[in-house]
Amino acid sequence: MDERVREHAAVLVDWSARVEAGDDVVLSVGPDAHDLAVAVAAELGDRGANLLATYGSGELTRAYLRAHDGDFDEDPAHELALLEETDVYL
């Protein structure tokens, strides 16, 4: 892995998000950010944070939208609950 990716991950975790031990962190990952996500996960582990990684892609979203035949929930409670219980969202 490029050392610059590790450095960027450290900046995100330490400076941008100011992650501390015990923080609950949601890391939203896309297909082009794999290396950065791995580096951020390592940084979070070093700091003793709790990680939940989510994955999204255009292909995944399209598959769901094409298959879904009903109305969408305008305010999905499960998403709100996740965010309310999260200390840091990256």
Which role does the model predict for each range below?
Residues M1-L90:
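Active-site bordering "gate/hinge" segments
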